[in-house]
Each structure stands twice: as C-alpha cells, then as structure tokens.
Amino acid sequence: YKRQLVDRIVPGFPRKDIAAIKEKLQYDDNMVVQAEIFHLWVIEAPQEVAAEFPADKAGLNVLFVPSEAPYHERKVTLLNGPHTVLSPVAYLSGINIVRDACQHPVVGKFIHKVMFEELMETLNLPKAELEKFAHDVLERFNNPFVDHQVTSIMLNSFPKYQTRDLPGLKTYLERKGKLPEGLVLGLAAIITYYKGGVRADGAEIVPNDAQEIMDLLKQLWATGDTAKVTEGVLGATFIWGEDLNLIPGLAEAVKKNLDSIQEKGMLETVKAIL
C-alpha cells in the first residue's frame, strides 16, 4: 500500500512478568512481546482493496481511507510528540514509567499543558475530535497493565523531537506569536539528559543516539557553559536541517531552562511554567 499508519504502544519484552507468563503458558517463549489492547491500522486505499483484503472484518481495527495524512498528523503530534518531551522531564524528575509521569502532581500537569494547550493548538482538525483523541491517548498512557519505561522512548530523542515536536513549536510560534513553554522545556530536558551522569537517587542517565550527536553533546557539555551548549545544539544543522538559533527567542528560552534545571532541578523548573 502506498501509505499506511500503525498505532499501538508496544513496550517490548515483559522482563518483570516473564516467569509468571511462562508458568501460565506452560512452555518457554522468549519471544513474548507486551503490548496494549488498543490498536489501529490505517490504510490509504480505495474500497476495492478493502473487499480484497477485508482485515476490518476479522475483528481488527483496520480503516481503509482516502487519505492517511490526517490520521498520521494527529497521532504523531498528540501521541508521539508528548511521549518525546515527557520522557526526559519524567526521568530527570525521578520517574521511570509513563503511567507514573501522568499521575504525578507536577509532571502530569506538564503533559496536559503540552498536549491540550500547545500541540493541539497547531492542528487543523475539529477541536472536539482532537480533545477526544487526546483524552484517549492519556487513558492509554495511564494503562495499569503496561509499565512503559520512559528510557525506552528516549532512544534517538533529537531526531524524534525534530519530526514530532519541532513542527508544532514553529506552528505555535507562528499562530500565537510566542514560544510554547512546554515544548521548549522538553527540548532543554533532552539536552540535559544527554549530559549523562546520575540522578539524585543514584540511577544512571545513559543517553543513546547516533554517535555524531553523542560526540557533539559530550563536547558541548564539557565546556560547562550553557550558552555554548544551547548555541551548539540549536546550530547543529545535521540534526535539524536548519539553524534553530534563527528562531526568535528560542536560544534564550532554552538556555534559561538549562540554567534552571542545573540550579533548581527539573521539578522546580516545570512548576515555573504551570
């Protein structure tokens, strides 16, 4: 098919529960994959294809549609976008699981702000439809049966931010005349996470990305100068395809957040924008 979209949160191998799962199955299966019940497969194709491949008649949530684009934009913006920025904010706040981040009195409000007050404002679909989708996403994030580790989401955070959050940041700035505070803080959180080290509770901070990005962040953080870190990251055209220092006010806002995270910690920095 020319264009498709799949939507399902798949945390991966259930290490914590694998012994109980094998006991229930009564055989060894080391290929077990944990996933949420929700699933969606959108296929851009004429209805003749649905007749030839009636997957939607097999109890599967499969949609055959004229255009996959609005489904793609909605999912990437309101599910993947929040995932990308909540994960470093949560981890640097001492939170390891997406569900716990959503239920946290401070980080939970941050997630809501990013979704409903910032990213949602950048989409052109009917507001009622977007609000329902966003609430459904939050319900999925709060799934009590899926322990979705935020560290698994943070793999390749810079390319993810570039595709999932940067378009929203630009559109928000264009429409509102100001930068979206949550998305800016999310970028600063990613930059801070790539500094590495350990959290206050002793947990390691281990970023994982393309070697060129890892080398750049190591070099920039070695200067100990958040202005140089900010300018260097935003100016890395091999990451962004452009120089983000040219976005009005962005460098100043990112540096301010970096300084606050270093001096006050993540939670206090988040509180300041709520």
Map each language-model feature to its residues.
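Substrate/ligand-engaging "lid" and interaction regions
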Residues: 2-274
